Swiss-Prot record:
Pathway: Cofactor biosynthesis; pyridoxal 5'-phosphate biosynthesis. It holds the Pfam family SOR_SNZ. Keywords: Lyase, Pyridoxal phosphate, Schiff base. D-ribose 5-phosphate binds at residues 23, 152, 250, 271-272. This is Pyridoxal 5'-phosphate synthase subunit PdxS. The keyword Lyase applies. GO terms for molecular function: amine-lyase activity; pyridoxal 5'-phosphate synthase (glutamine hydrolysing) activity.
Length: 330
Protein backbone atom coordinates (compact mmCIF):
# COMPACT_ATOMS: atom_id res chain seq x y z
CA UNK A 1 0.00 0.00 0.00
CA UNK A 2 1.31 3.44 -0.91
CA UNK A 3 1.65 5.54 2.21
CA UNK A 4 2.13 9.20 2.89
CA UNK A 5 -0.81 11.56 2.71
CA UNK A 6 -3.21 12.12 5.60
CA UNK A 7 -5.97 10.64 3.45
CA UNK A 8 -4.03 7.42 2.86
CA UNK A 9 -3.05 7.16 6.52
CA UNK A 10 -6.64 7.60 7.67
CA UNK A 11 -7.73 5.15 4.98
CA UNK A 12 -5.52 2.44 6.46
CA UNK A 13 -6.99 3.12 9.92
CA UNK A 14 -10.52 2.78 8.52
CA UNK A 15 -9.61 -0.61 7.04
CA UNK A 16 -9.38 -2.06 10.57
CA UNK A 17 -12.62 -0.39 11.75
CA UNK A 18 -15.08 -2.64 13.66
CA UNK A 19 -12.27 -5.11 14.32
CA UNK A 20 -9.95 -6.27 17.08
CA UNK A 21 -6.20 -5.59 17.23
CA UNK A 22 -4.37 -8.07 19.47
CA UNK A 23 -1.03 -7.78 21.27
CA UNK A 24 1.31 -10.66 20.41
CA UNK A 25 4.82 -11.45 21.61
CA UNK A 26 5.84 -14.22 19.20
CA UNK A 27 4.97 -15.92 15.91
CA UNK A 28 2.73 -18.55 17.54
CA UNK A 29 0.58 -15.89 19.21
CA UNK A 30 0.41 -13.87 15.99
CA UNK A 31 -0.88 -16.93 14.13
CA UNK A 32 -3.47 -17.57 16.85
CA UNK A 33 -4.62 -13.95 16.59
CA UNK A 34 -4.93 -14.20 12.81
CA UNK A 35 -6.85 -17.50 13.07
CA UNK A 36 -9.20 -15.93 15.64
CA UNK A 37 -10.10 -13.10 13.27
CA UNK A 38 -7.92 -10.20 14.44
CA UNK A 39 -7.79 -7.36 11.89
CA UNK A 40 -4.18 -6.62 12.90
CA UNK A 41 -1.61 -7.55 15.54
CA UNK A 42 0.56 -5.38 17.76
CA UNK A 43 4.05 -6.92 17.92
CA UNK A 44 5.91 -6.42 21.21
CA UNK A 45 8.29 -8.30 23.50
CA UNK A 46 6.02 -8.24 26.56
CA UNK A 47 2.29 -7.64 26.98
CA UNK A 48 1.37 -4.67 29.21
CA UNK A 49 0.69 -6.85 32.27
CA UNK A 50 4.27 -8.16 32.11
CA UNK A 51 5.66 -4.68 31.47
CA UNK A 52 3.81 -3.47 34.56
CA UNK A 53 5.05 -6.40 36.66
CA UNK A 54 8.67 -6.11 35.52
CA UNK A 55 9.02 -2.36 36.09
CA UNK A 56 12.18 -0.65 34.84
CA UNK A 57 12.33 1.05 31.45
CA UNK A 58 10.11 -0.32 28.66
CA UNK A 59 11.42 0.42 25.16
CA UNK A 60 10.68 -0.39 21.52
CA UNK A 61 10.82 -4.13 20.82
CA UNK A 62 13.71 -5.80 19.00
CA UNK A 63 13.19 -5.14 15.26
CA UNK A 64 14.09 -8.78 14.55
CA UNK A 65 11.10 -9.97 16.62
CA UNK A 66 8.79 -7.56 14.80
CA UNK A 67 10.08 -8.73 11.41
CA UNK A 68 9.55 -12.39 12.38
CA UNK A 69 5.93 -11.63 13.18
CA UNK A 70 5.51 -9.59 9.98
CA UNK A 71 6.79 -12.57 7.97
CA UNK A 72 4.45 -15.02 9.75
CA UNK A 73 1.04 -13.40 9.18
CA UNK A 74 -0.88 -11.83 6.32
CA UNK A 75 -2.75 -9.24 8.42
CA UNK A 76 -1.26 -5.80 9.22
CA UNK A 77 1.40 -5.59 11.93
CA UNK A 78 1.68 -2.62 14.27
CA UNK A 79 4.46 -1.88 16.77
CA UNK A 80 4.99 0.52 19.66
CA UNK A 81 7.50 3.32 20.14
CA UNK A 82 8.01 5.48 23.20
CA UNK A 83 6.22 8.83 23.42
CA UNK A 84 8.40 11.45 21.78
CA UNK A 85 11.07 8.96 20.64
CA UNK A 86 11.35 9.98 16.98
CA UNK A 87 14.26 7.61 16.31
CA UNK A 88 12.38 4.53 17.50
CA UNK A 89 9.57 5.57 15.15
CA UNK A 90 12.01 5.98 12.26
CA UNK A 91 13.36 2.48 12.92
CA UNK A 92 9.85 1.02 12.89
CA UNK A 93 9.06 2.86 9.67
CA UNK A 94 12.32 1.58 8.14
CA UNK A 95 11.45 -2.08 8.80
CA UNK A 96 8.02 -1.60 7.26
CA UNK A 97 5.45 -1.86 10.04
CA UNK A 98 1.92 -0.98 8.94
CA UNK A 99 1.21 1.40 11.82
CA UNK A 100 3.12 2.82 14.80
CA UNK A 101 1.58 3.15 18.26
CA UNK A 102 3.20 6.07 20.10
CA UNK A 103 2.39 4.41 23.37
CA UNK A 104 2.14 5.26 27.05
CA UNK A 105 2.59 1.53 27.76
CA UNK A 106 6.30 2.11 27.11
CA UNK A 107 8.37 4.47 29.24
CA UNK A 108 7.96 8.06 28.07
CA UNK A 109 11.05 9.36 26.20
CA UNK A 110 10.24 13.07 25.82
CA UNK A 111 8.75 14.89 28.84
CA UNK A 112 7.59 17.84 26.73
CA UNK A 113 6.43 16.71 23.30
CA UNK A 114 4.94 13.89 21.25
CA UNK A 115 6.36 13.00 17.84
CA UNK A 116 5.35 15.28 14.97
CA UNK A 117 3.72 12.49 13.02
CA UNK A 118 3.12 14.41 9.79
CA UNK A 119 6.83 13.99 8.97
CA UNK A 120 6.31 10.25 8.58
CA UNK A 121 4.85 8.18 5.75
CA UNK A 122 3.59 5.44 8.09
CA UNK A 123 0.31 6.08 9.99
CA UNK A 124 0.29 6.47 13.78
CA UNK A 125 -2.19 5.57 16.50
CA UNK A 126 -2.04 7.44 19.82
CA UNK A 127 -3.82 7.14 23.16
CA UNK A 128 -6.05 9.84 24.61
CA UNK A 129 -7.83 10.24 27.94
CA UNK A 130 -9.95 13.16 26.80
CA UNK A 131 -10.79 15.43 23.87
CA UNK A 132 -7.81 17.73 24.46
CA UNK A 133 -5.29 14.90 24.16
CA UNK A 134 -7.09 13.52 21.09
CA UNK A 135 -7.19 16.88 19.30
CA UNK A 136 -3.49 17.51 19.96
CA UNK A 137 -2.53 14.08 18.62
CA UNK A 138 -4.74 14.50 15.52
CA UNK A 139 -3.22 17.91 14.78
CA UNK A 140 0.24 16.31 15.09
CA UNK A 141 -0.78 13.76 12.47
CA UNK A 142 -2.29 10.73 14.24
CA UNK A 143 -4.49 8.68 11.88
CA UNK A 144 -6.17 6.80 14.73
CA UNK A 145 -6.97 7.51 18.38
CA UNK A 146 -7.59 4.97 21.14
CA UNK A 147 -8.55 5.34 24.76
CA UNK A 148 -5.61 4.93 27.11
CA UNK A 149 -7.57 3.05 29.74
CA UNK A 150 -5.14 1.48 32.19
CA UNK A 151 -3.15 -1.12 30.29
CA UNK A 152 -2.22 -4.45 31.83
CA UNK A 153 -4.96 -4.39 34.46
CA UNK A 154 -7.79 -6.36 32.87
CA UNK A 155 -9.99 -3.63 34.35
CA UNK A 156 -12.26 -1.77 31.92
CA UNK A 157 -13.14 1.17 34.21
CA UNK A 158 -10.51 3.62 32.91
CA UNK A 159 -11.29 2.92 29.25
CA UNK A 160 -14.96 3.61 30.03
CA UNK A 161 -13.96 6.81 31.84
CA UNK A 162 -11.93 8.05 28.88
CA UNK A 163 -14.62 7.24 26.32
CA UNK A 164 -17.32 8.94 28.38
CA UNK A 165 -15.12 12.02 28.89
CA UNK A 166 -14.55 12.16 25.13
CA UNK A 167 -18.23 11.74 24.29
CA UNK A 168 -19.38 14.39 26.76
CA UNK A 169 -16.75 16.88 25.59
CA UNK A 170 -17.87 16.41 21.98
CA UNK A 171 -21.50 16.90 23.00
CA UNK A 172 -20.61 20.13 24.81
CA UNK A 173 -18.48 21.30 21.88
CA UNK A 174 -21.48 20.99 19.58
CA UNK A 175 -23.41 23.44 21.75
CA UNK A 176 -20.64 26.07 21.62
CA UNK A 177 -20.29 29.08 19.37
CA UNK A 178 -17.24 29.17 17.10
CA UNK A 179 -15.80 31.87 19.35
CA UNK A 180 -16.09 29.56 22.35
CA UNK A 181 -14.50 26.75 20.35
CA UNK A 182 -11.56 29.05 19.59
CA UNK A 183 -11.18 29.61 23.34
CA UNK A 184 -10.99 25.85 23.83
CA UNK A 185 -8.29 25.67 21.13
CA UNK A 186 -6.24 28.32 22.98
CA UNK A 187 -6.55 26.34 26.21
CA UNK A 188 -5.55 23.07 24.53
CA UNK A 189 -2.55 24.77 22.87
CA UNK A 190 -1.03 25.77 26.22
CA UNK A 191 0.42 22.27 26.60
CA UNK A 192 2.91 23.01 23.80
CA UNK A 193 4.24 26.07 25.62
CA UNK A 194 5.48 24.20 28.71
CA UNK A 195 9.09 23.85 27.51
CA UNK A 196 9.41 27.55 26.65
CA UNK A 197 7.78 28.54 29.95
CA UNK A 198 10.07 26.24 31.95
CA UNK A 199 13.17 27.70 30.28
CA UNK A 200 12.01 31.28 30.87
CA UNK A 201 11.33 30.57 34.53
CA UNK A 202 14.83 29.09 34.81
CA UNK A 203 16.22 32.37 33.49
CA UNK A 204 14.29 34.42 36.01
CA UNK A 205 11.96 35.74 33.30
CA UNK A 206 8.15 35.89 33.24
CA UNK A 207 6.70 32.58 32.05
CA UNK A 208 4.89 34.24 29.16
CA UNK A 209 4.96 32.84 25.64
CA UNK A 210 4.13 35.19 22.77
CA UNK A 211 1.79 33.91 20.08
CA UNK A 212 4.37 34.62 17.34
CA UNK A 213 7.06 32.60 19.12
CA UNK A 214 8.02 29.18 17.61
CA UNK A 215 7.49 26.55 20.32
CA UNK A 216 7.05 23.15 18.62
CA UNK A 217 8.53 21.85 15.35
CA UNK A 218 8.87 25.43 14.09
CA UNK A 219 5.20 26.22 14.70
CA UNK A 220 4.29 29.37 16.61
CA UNK A 221 1.73 29.30 19.40
CA UNK A 222 -0.70 31.15 17.10
CA UNK A 223 -0.27 28.53 14.36
CA UNK A 224 -0.87 25.73 16.84
CA UNK A 225 -4.01 27.43 18.14
CA UNK A 226 -5.32 27.80 14.59
CA UNK A 227 -4.50 24.16 13.82
CA UNK A 228 -6.28 22.88 16.92
CA UNK A 229 -9.22 25.17 16.14
CA UNK A 230 -9.57 23.58 12.69
CA UNK A 231 -9.61 20.09 14.22
CA UNK A 232 -12.17 21.18 16.83
CA UNK A 233 -14.44 22.68 14.18
CA UNK A 234 -14.32 19.37 12.31
CA UNK A 235 -15.19 17.50 15.52
CA UNK A 236 -18.09 19.91 16.10
CA UNK A 237 -19.38 19.42 12.56
CA UNK A 238 -19.08 15.61 12.58
CA UNK A 239 -20.18 15.02 16.17
CA UNK A 240 -17.24 12.64 16.57
CA UNK A 241 -13.48 12.56 16.07
CA UNK A 242 -12.42 12.95 12.42
CA UNK A 243 -10.32 9.78 12.74
CA UNK A 244 -11.07 6.21 13.81
CA UNK A 245 -11.37 5.92 17.62
CA UNK A 246 -10.66 2.52 19.22
CA UNK A 247 -11.02 1.30 22.80
CA UNK A 248 -7.92 0.09 24.65
CA UNK A 249 -6.66 -0.47 28.16
CA UNK A 250 -8.37 -3.13 30.27
CA UNK A 251 -10.44 -5.13 27.77
CA UNK A 252 -10.50 -8.71 29.11
CA UNK A 253 -13.88 -10.24 28.18
CA UNK A 254 -16.27 -10.30 25.23
CA UNK A 255 -18.67 -8.19 27.28
CA UNK A 256 -15.93 -5.59 27.86
CA UNK A 257 -15.42 -5.31 24.10
CA UNK A 258 -19.17 -5.03 23.45
CA UNK A 259 -19.51 -2.36 26.14
CA UNK A 260 -16.84 -0.19 24.55
CA UNK A 261 -18.49 -0.57 21.14
CA UNK A 262 -21.83 0.46 22.66
CA UNK A 263 -20.12 3.59 24.01
CA UNK A 264 -19.11 4.55 20.47
CA UNK A 265 -15.75 2.86 19.88
CA UNK A 266 -14.89 1.99 16.28
CA UNK A 267 -13.01 -1.15 17.33
CA UNK A 268 -10.97 -2.64 20.15
CA UNK A 269 -7.33 -3.21 21.12
CA UNK A 270 -6.75 -6.17 23.43
CA UNK A 271 -3.37 -6.33 25.15
CA UNK A 272 -2.93 -8.72 28.04
CA UNK A 273 -6.54 -9.95 28.08
CA UNK A 274 -6.11 -12.76 25.55
CA UNK A 275 -2.74 -14.41 26.17
CA UNK A 276 -2.96 -13.96 29.95
CA UNK A 277 -6.21 -15.95 29.96
CA UNK A 278 -6.72 -19.72 30.30
CA UNK A 279 -7.86 -20.31 26.70
CA UNK A 280 -6.36 -17.66 24.39
CA UNK A 281 -7.72 -18.91 21.04
CA UNK A 282 -11.32 -19.28 22.20
CA UNK A 283 -11.23 -15.99 24.11
CA UNK A 284 -9.75 -14.21 21.10
CA UNK A 285 -12.50 -15.60 18.85
CA UNK A 286 -15.15 -14.62 21.38
CA UNK A 287 -13.88 -11.04 21.67
CA UNK A 288 -13.86 -10.71 17.87
CA UNK A 289 -17.46 -12.00 17.68
CA UNK A 290 -18.60 -9.72 20.51
CA UNK A 291 -16.98 -6.70 18.86
CA UNK A 292 -18.79 -7.36 15.56
CA UNK A 293 -22.08 -8.21 17.32
CA UNK A 294 -21.92 -5.75 20.22
CA UNK A 295 -25.61 -4.83 19.82
CA UNK A 296 -26.80 -8.47 19.97
CA UNK A 297 -26.73 -9.60 23.64
CA UNK A 298 -27.74 -13.15 22.73
CA UNK A 299 -24.60 -13.57 20.60
CA UNK A 300 -22.39 -11.93 23.24
CA UNK A 301 -23.90 -14.32 25.81
CA UNK A 302 -23.27 -17.36 23.63
CA UNK A 303 -19.63 -16.54 22.84
CA UNK A 304 -18.94 -15.76 26.51
CA UNK A 305 -19.67 -19.35 27.60
CA UNK A 306 -16.98 -21.81 28.69
CA UNK A 307 -13.98 -19.60 27.98
CA UNK A 308 -12.10 -20.62 31.10
CA UNK A 309 -10.43 -18.23 33.51
CA UNK A 310 -9.98 -14.62 32.37
CA UNK A 311 -6.74 -12.80 33.15
CA UNK A 312 -6.29 -11.90 36.80
CA UNK A 313 -7.30 -8.26 37.05
CA UNK A 314 -6.03 -5.36 39.14
CA UNK A 315 -8.23 -2.98 41.12
CA UNK A 316 -7.40 0.52 39.87
CA UNK A 317 -7.54 1.88 43.43
CA UNK A 318 -4.60 -0.39 44.29
CA UNK A 319 -2.33 1.30 41.72
CA UNK A 320 -0.49 4.43 42.82
CA UNK A 321 -0.79 7.54 40.66
CA UNK A 322 2.93 7.27 39.83
CA UNK A 323 2.41 3.73 38.48
CA UNK A 324 -0.51 4.60 36.21
CA UNK A 325 0.51 4.49 32.55
CA UNK A 326 -2.36 6.70 31.39
CA UNK A 327 -0.70 9.84 32.75
CA UNK A 328 2.29 9.48 30.43
CA UNK A 329 2.05 12.09 27.69
CA UNK A 330 -0.81 14.55 27.46
Amino acid sequence: MKKGTDLLKKGFAKMVKHGVVMDVTNVEQAQIAEEAGAVAVMALERVPADIRAAGGVARMSDPALIEEIMDAVSIPVMAKCRIGHTTEALVLEAIGVDMIDESEVLTQADPFFHIYKKKFNVPFVCGARNLGEAVRRIWEGAAMIRTKGEAGTGNIVEAVRHMRLMNEAIAQLQRMTDEEVYGVAKFYANRYAELAKTVREGMGLPATVLENEPIYEGFTLAEIIDGLYEVLLEVKKLGRLPVVNFAAGGVATPADAALMMQLGSDGVFVGSGIFKSENPLERARAIVEATYNYDKPDIVAEVSKNLGEAMKGIDITQISEAEKMQYRGD
